[in-house]
Swiss-Prot record:
This is Transcription antitermination protein NusB. Keywords: RNA-binding, Transcription, Transcription antitermination, Transcription regulation. The keyword Lipid metabolism does not apply. The lineage of its organism: Bacteria, Bacillati, Actinomycetota, Actinomycetes, Mycobacteriales. The keyword Glycosyltransferase does not apply. SUPFAM superfamilies: NusB-like (SSF48013). GO terms for molecular function: RNA binding. It comes from Mycolicibacterium vanbaalenii (strain DSM 7251 / JCM 13017 / BCRC 16820 / KCTC 9966 / NRRL B-24157 / PYR-1) (Mycobacterium vanbaalenii). InterPro entries: NusB-like_sf, NusB_fam, NusB_RsmB_TIM44. Involved in transcription antitermination. Required for transcription of ribosomal RNA (rRNA) genes. Binds specifically to the boxA antiterminator sequence of the ribosomal RNA (rrn) operons. One of its GO terms (biological process) is DNA-templated transcription termination. Belongs to the NusB family. It holds the Pfam family NusB.
Length: 163
């Protein structure tokens, strides 16, 4: 029987990462800075503030580190829209999902997309789940090439000759 509690924990971590990205954009800082500040506050106080789930921090740091590439990839697959015109929560959901598609090797692509659609159902407009699914479906088509190119570049930077 699968560990549904672990799945729920990862779902909550993604939702919290979306919250952090949303807050970061509203405050004009990075999600990594919000996560760092939140964990620092939790360490100083002993009341009801808990440290963030490590996966939430990983996602926040990953989206921050790869923000330009993630936004370019999302923008390339928006039809009739610009990233700035999307609801802020949809931007945050798409950023988390695209980071997972590109960088979370332990997350199967369909899981990343399904989780994003679920978050859109919970947090955004009635049209958002279908929109998020459509954009991520297009991103999934190019994900293997992007991962392969990143691996090739990584090999080249590690002194590999490629032959």
């Amino acid at each position: 029987m699968p560990d549904r509690k672990g799945d729920r924990g990862r779902h909550q971590a993604r939702k919290r990462a979306v919250d952090l990205l949303f807050e970061a954009e509203a405050r004009g800082i990075t999600a990594a800075e919000v996560a760092e500040a939140r964990n620092a506050l939790a360490e100083k106080r002993t009341d009801d503030i808990a440290t963030l789930n490590p996966y939430t921090v990983t996602v926040a740091q990953g989206v921050t580190a790869h923000a330009a590439h993630i936004d370019d990839l999302i923008s390339a697959h928006l039809q009739g829209w610009t990233l700035d015109r999307l609801p802020a929560v949809d931007r945050a959901i798409l950023r988390v999902a695209v980071w997972e598609l590109l960088h979370a090797e332990d997350v199967p692509e369909p899981v990343a997309v399904d989780e994003a659609v679920e978050l859109a159902k919970q947090l955004s407009t009635d049209d958002s789940p279908g929109f998020v699914n459509g954009v991520l479906g297009q991103v999934m088509l190019v994900t293997p090439q992007i991962r392969a190119a990143a691996a090739a570049m990584q090999g080249g930077h590690n002194g590999g000759s490629g032959t």
